[in-house]
A protein has these predicted regions:
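An N-terminally biased module of ancient metal coordination in phosphate/nucleic-acid-related enzymes
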Residues: 1-92, 100-102, 165-181, 188, ...
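Conserved active-site loop/cleft motifs that coordinate metal ions or position small ligands
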Residues: 39, 192-194, 227-233, 260-261
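Short acidic/histidine-rich active-site segments
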Residues: 42, 159, 226-241
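Mid-to-C-terminal alpha-helical segments outside catalytic/metal-binding sites
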Residues: 226-227, 241-272
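A short helix-to-beta-strand connector/capping loop
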Residues: 78-81, 104, 152, 224-226, ...
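Short acidic/His/Gly/Ser-rich catalytic and metal-binding motifs that mark active-site loops
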Residues: 46-49, 117-121
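Short low-complexity, flexible loop/linker segments enriched in glycine and/or proline
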Residues: 51-55, 206-214, 243-247
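Domain-core and long-helix interface of multi-subunit machines
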Residues: 104, 109-115, 121-223, 234
Length: 272
């Protein structure tokens, strides 16, 4: 069982448990026997590009966030390894800011929640938020490809999140999967099986899993050198508590035959 997690949020993002401190998260991971974690809260933006106000920390909170995690890293160094990081989105023109964030931290995970459409307006991967055209799905793949080529992320979070806005895994969705898998394999960047929706199913908050998407991971399983890992996407205590059961739900949803063909990496992001 994977005992590291590189997808952890904090109350600063505005949509996590406001009653949990950074240290509370650390204690929960220690309680579950984890040996290494990275805090990767939604990154601050120098310009206002948010699709809702409770999406990410303020830029003025960045230094306090990093200092808090560094303090916990030292305090708990004999019990668990802790890294600093951010979850980021790639947008054209943001490369300098993203590479600056990478230089300040241990891990950057790319969780692409939106793209610019042909009218230069943000289109968000949120269920029934707005219609998505083929060009929007392909733009999503293009952004991830460019970000990887520019050496921005260490990990791609929920690469199949684009399935939130469609019930069909058609030719375009298949093309998106291949672009992401091709690029990630070429550059050695792991793809994350996200556990947030499996936890939501366990808690009775939803009855259908949109991602992880079985068809996406079937394609991923065909790549001989593509790295994979699980990500809790922790915003709440229960997501850590239900970790093992969430993996079981995700594996059952994807299919154990597919899971067995995937190449899971260790805490150093290497396949043994």
């Amino acid at each position: 069982m994977q005992k590291f997690n590189y997808h952890t949020h904090t109350r600063r993002c505005g949509h996590a448990d406001n009653n949990m401190t950074d240290e509370d998260f650390v204690k929960e991971f220690i309680k579950k026997g984890f040996t290494k974690i990275a805090f990767t809260d939604h990154c601050p933006e120098k310009e206002e590009i948010d699709h809702r106000k409770n999406m990410r920390m303020k830029y003025s909170e960045k230094n306090e966030y990093l200092e808090s995690i560094k303090s916990l890293k030292e305090k708990y160094k004999d019990r668990i390894e802790i890294e600093t990081g951010f979850e980021v989105e790639y947008l054209p023109g943001q490369e300098e800011n993203l590479l600056e964030l990478k230089n300040e931290t241990d891990k950057l995970i790319l969780g692409q929640h939106f793209v610019y459409d042909d009218k230069n307006e943000l289109k968000i991967f949120r269920r029934r938020y707005e219609p998505f055209e083929d060009v929007d799905f392909l733009k999503y793949a293009e952004y991830i490809k460019i970000a990887i080529e520019k050496n921005i992320p260490n990990i791609i979070a929920h690469p199949d999140i684009y399935m939130l806005v469609t019930d069909t895994f058609g030719k375009t969705q298949e093309t998106v999967a291949h672009i992401i898998c091709d690029t990630a394999e070429k550059y050695g960047i792991p793809l994350e099986i996200n556990l947030s929706q499996p936890v939501a199913v366990l808690k009775g908050e939803r009855d259908k899993i949109m991602y992880p998407c079985k068809e996406f991971w079937k394609i991923a399983s065909e790549y001989e050198n593509l790295k994979v890992l699980y990500g809790i996407d922790a915003h709440w205590r229960e997501q850590i508590e239900l970790y093992e059961k969430a993996i079981e739900v995700a594996n059952e949803h994807i299919g154990q035959d597919i899971i067995n063909k995937l190449h899971f990496c260790n805490e150093n992001l290497e396949v043994e």
